[in-house]
């Protein structure tokens, strides 16, 4: 489930300007040669983070998912959850958020979870879903707290089947998460949107990457 075309196009443009979305030749962790790269760590100043929070908030509100709070898995998810709840508050919806520590504390407030009490319907927020490990850990922590995971919110759905360069799985990581946990995955943008953006772009240098992206999707995409 991706955001509407306007929000998606604006986000893709924003990611390109921030050099978070790049085109060229990049080797993925799975050993595949990808014609594009998405690195959410490039949203690294106040203005970019503020804008990013608004894109996440808009995608979440447009999804019509019912939720009570956000949860950001360490480490990237912490900043994303904070930015998004600020954007939601600016839009008139004040919701709590929480996150986890990588290692439990045995002093002070202790425990693994930090922030608001984890309860009600919880949206997990992250940048992308690669192997789904972060989501599985988050679902486990949320359920152990007695709350209900209700959706996963990400920036980009690569729409790419799992596996390696040689061994290609039947499903994408997003599809696997949706099937395993019965949770909808909401994305601000997806690969279909990126390809549509390239197709419509008046920037020849940018649109020249479309054949490589299409070939990559034909080989590894869903």
Swiss-Prot record:
Gene Ontology terms: cellular component: cytoplasm
Any one GO molecular-function label of the UniProt entry: orotate phosphoribosyltransferase activity
Domain of life, per lineage: Bacteria
Reaction it catalyzes: orotidine 5'-phosphate + diphosphate = orotate + 5-phospho-alpha-D-ribose 1-diphosphate
Keyword Magnesium: yes
Biological processes, Gene Ontology terms: 'de novo' pyrimidine nucleobase biosynthetic process; 'de novo' UMP biosynthetic process; pyrimidine ribonucleoside biosynthetic process
Annotated EC: 2.4.2.10
Binding site for 5-phospho-alpha-D-ribose 1-diphosphate: 29, 75-76, 101-102, 105, 107, 126-134
Residue positions binding orotate: 37-38, 130, 158
Annotated InterPro entries: OPRT (IPR023031), Or_phspho_trans_dom (IPR004467), PRibTrfase_dom (IPR000836), PRTase-like (IPR029057)
Pathway: Pyrimidine metabolism; UMP biosynthesis via de novo pathway; UMP from orotate: step 1/2
Required cofactor names: Mg(2+)
This protein's UniProt keywords: Glycosyltransferase, Magnesium, Pyrimidine biosynthesis, Transferase
Function noted in UniProt: Catalyzes the transfer of a ribosyl phosphate group from 5-phosphoribose 1-diphosphate to orotate, leading to the formation of orotidine monophosphate (OMP).
Cross-referenced PANTHER family: OROTATE PHOSPHORIBOSYLTRANSFERASE 1-RELATED (PTHR46683:SF1)
Subunit comment: Homodimer.
Family assignment from sequence similarity: Belongs to the purine/pyrimidine phosphoribosyltransferase family. PyrE subfamily.
Name used for this protein in its record: Orotate phosphoribosyltransferase
Recorded name of the encoding gene: pyrE
